[in-house]
């Protein structure tokens, strides 16, 4: 019966564990070994890999595809390693043995580290401890890689614009149109940047519409001639209601790019893309949607001074908005306090509806008849005080 000798510790340690590597950079570290008893070691090997993988089930068919970015193998030596083919290292308890390693990542595009529902891009170093008459011991450690996406290129610094118009109908009867045109100053952004939106909206239908904007991520997986697409809404902003026969404009409405991974565009089996959707919610009808493509990069294209100025302006505006008026305001419109159960919006676009926290206005401009009491007449005279005065006179 063969008794397996236990290893106290066997691990891969990087010199800079928090570093995010790029193409052409050197990955360096060491493999450390500690034993519980005297152990003969034949070899310590490493295997470094970088691979993109996608996998999902399409009915009874398994859709699977892989793409290699990195493969590096090496046999490591101690600094005082015995020489010779049959020479082995005798490891003793109480000592810590370190095997150093280093390799360079390939030049050119690399897939950014990513983990999605149906695929991932992983980079790791796996170490193997070979011992005679013993099973091979393994240790694995992942490291992060980010492909450079420079948003300062002319293509990504160019403005992006689009416009769209939709005819609205009610019971097959034409009910006017809703149109939207929008523009952003550039296509490339990085996390923390503010997207300045310029848009014009026109509503000639009889309904109250609401303009909104959202940043959306699309994950596309490709394998065996099949495609799987997942879409996720990341952040959003909305404007004021637009009543019938009126227009509205956004002049620099801001939407911040949250902490997200850069775009992955150069991989043949996995893509991560982003879009700015500017859309108008039309109750009882499909939304009018503009899709402006975005590229999220790894190098900021907006100066810190611009961000600082925008932040300061936003702060000053917030103080203006919080000023308390000298005269008391009138009570809110009765329509504003109607329970949400009486409001209606057709869930024609689930992605854009799911994250909208509040419902929009009633469908038509003219008020429908509700089955509850009408509001009391507004007056600034307290009726209780008036009744007390009348009683005193009597």
From Swiss-Prot:
Position(s), cross-link Glycyl lysine isopeptide (Lys-Gly) (interchain with G-Cter in ubiquitin): 212
Molecular function via GO: enzyme inhibitor activity; ubiquitin protein ligase binding
InterPro entries: Arrestin-like_C, Arrestin-like_N, Arrestin_C-like, Arrestin_domain-protein, Ig_E-set
Location in the cell: Cytoplasm
UniProt KW keywords: Cell cycle, Cytoplasm, Disulfide bond, Isopeptide bond, Phosphoprotein, Transcription, Transcription regulation, Tumor suppressor, Ubl conjugation
Biological processes per GO annotation: cellular response to tumor cell; keratinocyte differentiation; negative regulation of cell division; negative regulation of transcription by RNA polymerase II; platelet-derived growth factor receptor signaling pathway; positive regulation of apoptotic process; protein import into nucleus; protein transport
Function per UniProt: May act as an oxidative stress mediator by inhibiting thioredoxin activity or by limiting its bioavailability. Interacts with COPS5 and restores COPS5-induced suppression of CDKN1B stability, blocking the COPS5-mediated translocation of CDKN1B from the nucleus to the cytoplasm. Functions as a transcriptional repressor, possibly by acting as a bridge molecule between transcription factors and corepressor complexes, and over-expression will induce G0/G1 cell cycle arrest. Required for the maturation of natural killer cells. Acts as a suppressor of tumor cell growth.
Self-association and partners: Homodimer; disulfide-linked. Interacts with TXN/thioredoxin through its redox-active site. Interacts with transcriptional repressors ZBTB16, ZBTB32 and HDAC1. Interacts with DDIT4.
Family in the record: Belongs to the arrestin family.
Protein name: Thioredoxin-interacting protein
């Amino acid at each position: 019966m063969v008794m397996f000798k236990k290893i106290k510790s066997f691990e891969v340690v990087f010199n800079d564990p928090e570093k995010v590597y790029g193409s052409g950079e050197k990955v360096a570290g060491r493999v450390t070994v500690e034993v519980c008893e005297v152990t003969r070691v034949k070899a310590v090997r490493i295997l470094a890999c970088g691979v993109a993988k996608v996998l999902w089930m399409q009915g009874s068919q398994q859709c699977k595809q892989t793409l290699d970015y990195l493969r590096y193998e090496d046999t490591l030596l101690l600094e005082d390693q015995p020489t010779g083919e049959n020479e082995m290292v005798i490891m003793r308890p109480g000592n810590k043995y370190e095997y150093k390693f280093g390799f360079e990542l390939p030049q050119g595009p690399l897939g950014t580290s990513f983990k999605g529902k149906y695929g991932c891009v992983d980079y790791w170093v796996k170490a193997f401890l070979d011992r005679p008459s013993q099973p091979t011991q393994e240790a694995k450690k992942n490291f992060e890689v980010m492909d450079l996406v420079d948003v300062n290129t002319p293509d990504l610094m160019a403005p992006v614009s689009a416009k769209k118009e939709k005819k609205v109908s009610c019971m097959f009867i034409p009910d006017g149109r809703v149109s939207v045109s929008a523009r952003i100053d550039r296509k490339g952004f990085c996390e923390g940047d503010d997207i300045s939106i310029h848009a014009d909206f026109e509503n000639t239908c009889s309904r109250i519409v609401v303009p909104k904007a959202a940043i959306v991520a699309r994950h596309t997986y490709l394998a065996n001639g099949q495609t799987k697409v997942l879409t996720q809404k990341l952040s959003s902003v909305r404007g004021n209601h637009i009543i019938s026969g009126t227009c509205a404009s956004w002049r620099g409405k801001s939407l911040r790019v949250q902490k997200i991974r850069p775009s992955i565009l150069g991989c043949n089996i996995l893509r991560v893309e982003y879009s700015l959707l500017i859309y108008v919610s039309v109750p009882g009808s499909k939304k009018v949607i503009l899709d402006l493509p975005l590229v999220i990069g790894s190098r900021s294209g907006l100066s810190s001074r611009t961000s600082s100025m925008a932040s300061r302006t936003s702060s000053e505006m917030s103080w203006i908005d919080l000023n308390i008026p000298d005269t008391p305001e009138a009570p809110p419109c009765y329509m504003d306090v109607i329970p949400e159960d009486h409001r209606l919006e057709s869930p024609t676009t689930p992605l854009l509806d799911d994250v909208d926290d509040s419902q929009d206005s009633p469908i038509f401009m003219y008020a429908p008849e509700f089955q509850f009491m009408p509001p009391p007449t507004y007056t600034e005279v307290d009726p209780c005080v008036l009744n007390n005065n009348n009683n005193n006179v009597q």
